[in-house]
């Protein structure tokens, strides 16, 4: 069974498994910026509900507001109106410290560019979120090593980012996002800087990790073939999210 057939089977099993708890939800989210003295509405009454273990793709034209949506979903930016809840807790009802603690505990982030610290090894880059939580160096490295094994890079733990390929660096970034065992990972064009075959491998890895770790993924991508491998697709057009029908791959 090839990767895509396997993914399609697992997606169908997931969809047939009934409703699961909602880990991330946006209700009536609107985001407006002021540009050149004019109000520009990027998000218009956006509604998003992400279930545990679900893979949700967000697609849309360049400049349509996909990254803005991820920032709002991740509590990195506040909506002009509406509400975002993480594990049932609305960000707007939390003090800044509580919001940061919840975000750091329950969310992981992956970007188009890996943002690894060049002076640290792959192992210590992955361990960094745990060290920020004041976990001991020894324990943090143990968890980081286990996660590197899961992304197939156990043998590269002592290498620095400059000694890794583009695909390997992105796999380290994925391991870093998952090492805290978040409920949901927000990924902004995670394969956009990779060649076709490497992008395909990295995307498959994310979907497989979502299944094995029961972690939700919200993935912004411009690639319709990759988006079709997720459980659901939402298209952002003129600030409004539209759900698209699943198309077998």
From Swiss-Prot:
Where does the source fall among the domains of life?
Answer: Bacteria
- UniProt keyword list: ATP-binding, Cell inner membrane, Cell membrane, Membrane, Nucleotide-binding, Translocase, Transport
Q: Where in the cell is it found?
A: Cell inner membrane
Provide the membrane topology annotation.
Peripheral membrane protein
Please state what class of enzyme this protein is.
Answer: translocase
Q: Does the keyword ATP-binding apply?
A: yes
GO MF terms here are: ATP binding; ATP hydrolysis activity; transmembrane transporter activity
Subunit composition and interactions: The complex is composed of two ATP-binding proteins (LolD) and two transmembrane proteins (LolC and LolE).
Describe the family membership recorded for this protein in Swiss-Prot or TrEMBL. Answer: Belongs to the ABC transporter superfamily. Lipoprotein translocase (TC 3.A.1.125) family.
Q: What is this protein called?
A: Lipoprotein-releasing system ATP-binding protein LolD
Native source organism of the sequence: Burkholderia mallei (strain ATCC 23344)
The UniProt gene name for this protein comes to lolD
